[in-house]
Swiss-Prot record:
Natural source organism: Rotavirus A (strain RVA/Human/United Kingdom/ST3/1975/G4P2A[6]) (RV-A)
Post-translational modification: The C-terminal region is phosphorylated by host CKII/CSNK2A1. Phosphorylation of the DSGXS motif is essential for host NF-kappa-B inhibition.
Family named by the database record: Belongs to the rotavirus NSP1 family.
Motif (pLxIS motif): 480-483
Description of how the protein assembles with itself and partners: Interacts (via C-terminus) with host IRF3; this interaction leads to IRF3 degradation. Interacts with host IRF7; this interaction leads to IRF7 degradation. Interacts with host CUL1 and CUL3. Interacts with host BTRC.
Annotated S-S bridges: none
HAMAP family attached to this UniProt entry: ROTA_NSP1
Region: RNA-binding, residue numbers: 1-81
Protein name, per record: Non-structural protein 1
GO cellular component: host cell cytoplasm; host cytoskeleton
GO BP term, pick one: symbiont-mediated suppression of host cytoplasmic pattern recognition receptor signaling pathway via inhibition of IRF3 activity
Region Interaction with host IRF3: start-end pairs: 317-486
Alphabetized UniProt keyword annotations: Host cytoplasm, Host cytoskeleton, Host-virus interaction, Inhibition of host innate immune response by virus, Inhibition of host IRF3 by virus, Inhibition of host IRF7 by virus, Inhibition of host NF-kappa-B by virus, Inhibition of host RLR pathway by virus, Interferon antiviral system evasion, Metal-binding, Phosphoprotein, RNA-binding, Viral immunoevasion
Length: 486
């Protein structure tokens, strides 16, 4: 049983504030939810279980029970998950406010302990102070958190997470902020709480406290396409697809790291909750994570033999050729932008090969083929540049004054001609490695200019940022027929 979940279940009965704040989906009647996919910790109830995607950010961090409330750590409504979420620079005062909130919602004193013991002793087998009956009293106050970095903003979701060594397939990693606060001071707070417990429970409380307060922070993870809803990934190849998300909001915005102080004034907190509502946003999929997913999918279907062929059609329109025909039934080719990039890259590469190598047919086996498979994924800059360099070397460049050149005197299509003029100012007769890098990047940047893209989608924006973008109608970046250059 998850300690935090149990604590919320029992403590929500002690007063009106707790009844509202500690209400978790996992402790209520179960409702159907999307199929679970990843193992990890639910940010809402802190239990380790199978996770489903969040309706607010499309990442996997909700269990199938908590998903019914649709709470996200990026909401503006001050529910418990939001009040436990801190952002960027966390100060000692911020952590003091968090500890005060814990003491307000999960107090341990003689009156509370006696109340729980009396309500638990309903049967002979419950007379002993066994941990399974008093799990809710064994939640220490720690500064344990799950952290994530989203385009320069670091979020810390504090809570009590059991079984830290269990499998974690989410983009969140454990962080310990006790050094920002004070170890001895936090020890004293927990020892005071522990002193009210029966002796039989004190040792278990101490073990839990020290195991969750003295660990070393993990290395922060990189967010990838695997961490987002499968439904979003499946629809990425539709250029007009928009991600639909919902956020729990209030009319007033407060200091992000100061949200945990709201429980100090109960009447003001309830007045604030009266303005709570759900806002709906339609979000573009444009970001580096999703762009790289598209380019990687296209890379799996590359037919490198086209660069030595004599086909008069573009690379994606070749039919009935054993070595050059691609399977257009794959979803990745539904995005005309990917097809444009593929056609122009291979038209340019074929012109390079035909200008510098004596190869007459696509059935020939050439060393250059093994390096062409990585020419689309420009998001992996180091790997991409290595591939382009190897292709350049396969063309047997001529060195003049310490600079290597290759010929460029084969015909190319009008799209490539226009891009040549835009990138190098003319249609050249000779090219250096740097020229080729610039031209190939220009072909890809025409449709997916990753230089000006966020790493993660705008679904990971806070509500305030989403509202600002919606005012300027910028949550949807561009119509599907207009390129990044245009």
């Amino acid at each position: 049983m998850a300690t935090f979940k149990d604590a919320c279940y029992y403590y929500k009965r002690i007063n009106k504030l707790n009844h509202v704040v500690l209400k978790l989906g996992v402790n209520d009647t179960w409702r159907p939810s999307p199929p679970t996919k990843y193992k990890g910790w639910c940010l809402d109830c802190c239990q380790h279980t199978d996770l489903t995607y969040c309706q607010g950010c499309t990442m996997y961090h909700d269990c199938q029970w908590c998903s019914q409330y649709g709470r996200c750590f990026l909401d503006s409504e001050p529910h418990l998950l939001r009040m436990r979420t801190f952002k960027n620079e966390v100060t000692k005062n911020d952590l003091m406010n968090l500890i005060d909130m814990y003491n307000t919602l999960f107090p341990i004193n003689q009156k509370i302990v006696d109340k729980f013991i009396n309500s638990t002793r309903q049967h002979k087998c419950r007379n002993e102070c066994m941990t399974q009956w008093y799990n809710h009293l064994l939640m220490p106050i720690t500064l344990q958190s799950l952290s994530i970095e989203l385009d320069g903003d670091v979020y810390y979701v504090f809570g009590y997470y059991d079984s830290m060594s269990d499998i974690n397939q989410t983009p969140f990693s454990f962080a310990n902020l006790i050094d920002i606060y004070d170890k001895l001071l936090l020890d004293n707070i927990n020892f005071n709480r522990m002193s009210f417990l029966p002796v039989a429970l004190q040792q278990e409380y101490a073990l839990r406290y020290f195991s969750k307060s003295r660990f070393i922070s993990e290395k922060r993870k990189c967010v990838s396409d695997l961490h987002f809803s499968a439904n979003v990934i499946e629809n990425l190849h539709n250029p007009s697809f928009k991600i639909q998300i919902t956020r729990n909001c209030i009319e007033l915005s407060s200091d992000w790291n100061g949200a945990c102080k709201l429980v100090e004034d109960v009447s003001a907190y309830f007045d604030m909750l009266k303005t709570s509502h759900i806002e709906f946003y339609s979000i573009s999929t444009r970001c580096r994570v999703f762009t790289q997913h598209k380019l990687k999918m296209a890379s799996k279907h590359i037919k490198p033999n086209y660069v030595t062929s004599n086909h008069r059609t573009s690379a994606t329109e070749v039919h009935n050729c054993k070595w050059c025909s691609i399977n257009n039934s794959y979803a990745v080719w539904n995005d005309f932008r990917v097809k444009k990039i593929y056609d122009n890259i291979f038209n340019f590469l074929r012109a390079l090969v035909k200008s510098n190598a004596n190869v007459g047919h696509c059935s020939s086996q050439e060393k250059i083929y093994e390096h062409i498979e990585d020419v689309l994924d420009v998001c992996d800059d180091e790997k991409w540049k290595t591939a382009v360099t190897e292709i350049f070397n396969c063309l047997e460049p001529v060195e003049l004054d310490a600079v290597k050149y290759v010929l460029f005197n084969h015909e190319v299509n009008w799209d490539v001609i226009n891009l040549l003029v835009q990138s190098v100012g003319k249609v050249p007769q000779i090219l250096t490695l740097n020229d080729i890098v610039i031209i190939m990047k220009s072909i890809i940047y025409e449709w997916f200019d990753i230089r000006y893209m966020r790493n993660t989608p705008m679904t990971t924006f806070t509500v305030d940022k989403l509202r600002q973008l919606c005012t300027g109608v910028k949550t949807v970046d561009y119509d599907s027929g207009i390129s990044d250059v245009e």
